[in-house]
């Protein structure tokens, strides 16, 4: 089909005229072909245009900025946030409410910690383990010179109400295992046992606070909560009450309630903890609490060690958010120590209605920040008046002494942030464990060996270490038995060790820890004298001790405490850094003959070894003919290569099978040798105990360890080095070197 060009152009004359008019438009900038500029930048010549004009109004000429501003606002308006961002806060609150014991319950400071700490699941909670920053030494330094805070809100508060509640709950406690007795409302630490099973049936430590004759508050570690509640319910025949907001158990006489969510507990440690706390709170002007406030101010200005351990101070403060401003310096009046004589105790914290009223009056965060920004000095006071309890912790444990703070849960995070803005350093579980070791105190439940919680933590640690050990290649694993002669590298086996040292005719008994403080003091005096220890040689009794290395050495957990020989003591006096090496276990006579024959065969020297032959044929080597001719096909090369690879695979498989069978035989031989060897004599020095914790002390500059030794061995080591000093040999489970260390009885009770 053909068309006539003249008729086609005549029919479209008007369209062509409009196109030419648009192209030749004098109003447009030179070079533009569009009708009317679409943006402000297109009104400029090409040499004046910049890509940044779409974002920065200052790129336009001054005469065009007012016109271009409207284009930029409409084009770059803030877009709507994503669906995830819009629902982030609501999802966080929902997730906080959904957190259960299976995934780990969140504490009130969880979000703050999760941004700064590595979180782990422990005892049914999500807890902060260690900081992302490298502040391990800084935390220890501040715990001795400044102030450190730890969140211990995972402790469980159990309230017991009945007539003479303190005497009834004392059925689970042993008087000789605790320190000083409390006065009035003071808090004290008890060691809980199953009724009628002492010295066995240890449950764990707990803190008691009695308000009156009919009410006692007990703070207990979550790892021992189930065992304690089970024993309490069975002993008093308590029944759980249904349709109640909190866990409630009672009978005709006793009422037991568990409050694990409404109260938070913080621990401040360090010499400046009271002064930091004073600068972080704003007191409510209430006459009822004026004497308590004055007493706290007098204590905060005085020497911290002058306060009594367990002393309770009740305070009423404003909303902690009112002290968030770092520039605001709170000025409190100075009060003398004589305020103690006029002190009137007022306690509103344990009044549930008073706490709930403060929670209801708490101002929302959005409203608080709105009012705080509109006022010159910020918000100074709100309707919410927060009751808190301050508990002095003066136990003589260096890095652990300080104060505990009890505060209602909705105000806990605000109070935490207020302390952070005053320079208080936060720490996690690893730092707390290190602080216990620096203070030479047992850390419950990881260092405890007599309770169910301690045994469970030991099994969990054993499982973790075995998985890590089996994950290494065979040639990178430590040969604990054949190389360093360690029978149990990942466990303690206290029952077996105590039985090996049971030299009397008394019946076999399970291992238990001596926690009687008076008995431990008598044992320490007897060790200094070197006599009178025979009466304490009970079968199965373990004595907690602390070890101080005075030479080289860095003790570790699962280290062995051994009995030194006379030669060891002589060599230590000459050179305390001399290394005593552990020899591997002796093999049987048949095995030794084989080893000797193999050594003779390997040492056999050839006739002409070391001489060069002068014969020409001696230096000749066979040459492969295939390498001389290039006529070999590629197919032959591929076939040869494939055969070579397959041959290597078969050889490697055969070699692995032989090595696997060899390792299996060696493991069976080792098991037979272990069964035939007593735990006590498994090393070339008699084992008398094990280490449950140990590390190089940052503050002292030498190795420090904590462990247990059998009571039957005390007479063998008493004052063996000096009139008042006892020395033992310590060896780690992965080392072959023995190191000397002073041993001292640990007289501090296990505390939380």
Swiss-Prot record:
The record's gene field reads: popl-1
> What is its subcellular localisation?
Nucleus, Nucleolus
What does the record give as the reaction this protein catalyses?
Endonucleolytic cleavage of RNA, removing 5'-extranucleotides from tRNA precursor
An example of a GO molecular function for this protein is: hydrolase activity
Q: Which residues cross the membrane?
A: none
**Span list, region Disordered:** 638-663
- The EC number(s) this enzyme carries: 3.1.26.5
Alphabetical GO CC annotations of the entry are: nucleolar ribonuclease P complex; ribonuclease MRP complex
Main localization of the protein described in the UniProt heading: nucleus
* One Pfam family here: POP1_N
Organism of origin is Caenorhabditis elegans
Q: Quaternary form?
A: Component of nuclear RNase P and RNase MRP ribonucleoproteins. Several subunits of RNase P are also part of the RNase MRP complex.
Keyword tRNA processing (UniProt):
yes
Q: What name is this protein filed under?
A: Ribonucleases P/MRP protein subunit popl-1
Q: Does the keyword Coiled coil apply?
A: no
Domain of life of the source: Eukaryota
Q: Where is the composition biased (Basic residues)?
A: 640-657
Described by its record, this protein's role is as follows: Component of ribonuclease P, a ribonucleoprotein complex that generates mature tRNA molecules by cleaving their 5'-ends. Also a component of the MRP ribonuclease complex, which cleaves pre-rRNA sequences.
Task: Could you list this entry's UniProt keywords, alphabetically sorted.
Answer: Hydrolase, Nucleus, RNA-binding, tRNA processing
Please cite one Gene Ontology biological process associated with this protein: tRNA processing
């Amino acid at each position: 089909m053909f068309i006539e060009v003249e008729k086609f152009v005549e029919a479209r004359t008007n369209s062509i005229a409009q196109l030419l008019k648009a192209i030749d438009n004098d109003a447009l900038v030179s070079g533009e072909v569009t009708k009317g500029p679409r943006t402000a930048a297109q009104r400029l010549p090409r040499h004046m245009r910049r890509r940044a004009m779409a974002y920065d109004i200052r790129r336009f000429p001054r005469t065009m900025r007012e016109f271009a501003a409207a284009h930029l606002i409409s084009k770059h308006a803030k877009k709507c946030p994503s669906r995830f961002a819009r629902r982030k806060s609501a999802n966080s609150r929902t997730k906080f409410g959904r957190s259960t014991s299976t995934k780990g319950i969140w504490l009130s400071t969880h979000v703050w910690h999760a941004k700064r700490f590595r979180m782990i699941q422990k005892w049914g909670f999500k807890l902060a383990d260690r900081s992302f920053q490298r502040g391990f030494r800084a935390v220890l330094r501040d715990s001795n010179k400044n102030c450190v805070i730890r969140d211990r809100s995972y402790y469980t508060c159990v309230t017991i109400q009945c007539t003479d509640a303190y005497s009834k709950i004392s059925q689970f406690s042993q008087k000789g295992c605790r320190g000083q007795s409390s006065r009035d409302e003071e808090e004290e630490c008890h060691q809980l046992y199953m009724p009628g099973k002492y010295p066995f049936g240890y449950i764990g430590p707990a803190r008691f606070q009695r308000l009156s004759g009919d009410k006692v508050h007990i703070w207990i570690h979550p790892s021992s909560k189930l065992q304690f509640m089970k024993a309490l319910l069975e002993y008093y025949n308590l029944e759980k009450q249904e349709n109640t907001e909190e866990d409630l158990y009672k009978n005709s006489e006793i009422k037991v309630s568990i409050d694990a969510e409404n109260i938070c507990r913080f621990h401040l440690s360090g010499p400046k903890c009271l002064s930091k706390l004073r600068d972080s709170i704003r007191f409510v002007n209430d006459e009822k609490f004026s004497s308590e406030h004055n007493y706290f101010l007098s204590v905060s200005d005085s020497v911290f060690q002058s306060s009594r351990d367990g002393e309770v101070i009740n305070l009423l403060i404003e909303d902690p958010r009112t002290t968030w401003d770092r520039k605001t310096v709170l000025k409190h009046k100075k009060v003398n120590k004589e305020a103690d004589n006029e002190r009137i105790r007022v306690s509103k914290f344990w009044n549930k209605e008073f706490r709930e009223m403060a929670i209801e009056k708490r101002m929302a965060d959005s409203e608080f920040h709105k009012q705080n920004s509109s006022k010159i000095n910020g918000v100074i006071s709100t309707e919410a008046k927060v009751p808190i309890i301050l508990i002095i912790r003066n136990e003589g444990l260096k890095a652990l002494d300080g104060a505990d703070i009890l505060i209602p849960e909705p105000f806990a995070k605000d109070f935490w942030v207020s302390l952070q803005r005053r320079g208080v350093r936060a720490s996690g579980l690893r730092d707390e464990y290190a602080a216990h070791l620096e203070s030479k105190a047992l850390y419950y439940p990881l260092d405890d060996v007599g309770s169910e919680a301690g045994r469970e933590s030991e099994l969990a640690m054993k499982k973790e270490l075995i998985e890590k050990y089996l994950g290494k290649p065979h040639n990178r694993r430590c040969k604990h038995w054949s190389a360093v002669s360690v029978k149990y590298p990942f466990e303690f086996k206290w029952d077996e060790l105590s039985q090996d040292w049971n030299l009397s005719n008394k019946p076999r008994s399970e291992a238990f820890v001596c926690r009687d403080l008076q008995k431990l003091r008598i044992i320490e005096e007897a060790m200094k004298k070197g006599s009178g220890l025979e009466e304490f040689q009970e079968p199965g009794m373990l004595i907690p001790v602390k070890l101080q290395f005075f030479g080289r050495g860095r003790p570790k957990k699962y280290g062995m405490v051994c009995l030194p020989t006379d030669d060891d003591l002589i060599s230590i006096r000459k050179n305390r850094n001399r290394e005593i090496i552990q020899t591997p276990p002796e093999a049987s006579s048949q095995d030794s003959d084989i080893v000797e024959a193999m050594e003779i065969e390997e040492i056999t020297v050839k006739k002409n070894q070391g001489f060069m032959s002068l014969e020409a044929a001696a230096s000749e080597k066979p040459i492969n003919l295939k390498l001389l001719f290039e006529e070999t096909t590629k197919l032959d090369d591929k076939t040869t290569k494939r055969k070579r690879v397959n041959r290597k695979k078969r050889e490697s498989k055969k070699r692995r099978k032989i090595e696997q069978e060899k390792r299996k035989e060696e493991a069976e031989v080792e098991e037979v040798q272990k069964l035939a060897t007593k735990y006590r004599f498994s090393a070339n020095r008699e084992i008398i105990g094990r280490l449950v914790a140990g590390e190089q002390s940052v503050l002292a500059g030498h190795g420090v360890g904590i462990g247990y030794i059998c009571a039957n061995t005390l007479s063998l080591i008493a004052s063996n080095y000096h009139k008042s000093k006892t020395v033992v040999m310590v060896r780690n489970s992965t080392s072959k070197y023995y190191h000397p260390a002073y041993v001292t009885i640990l007289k501090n009770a296990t505390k939380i």
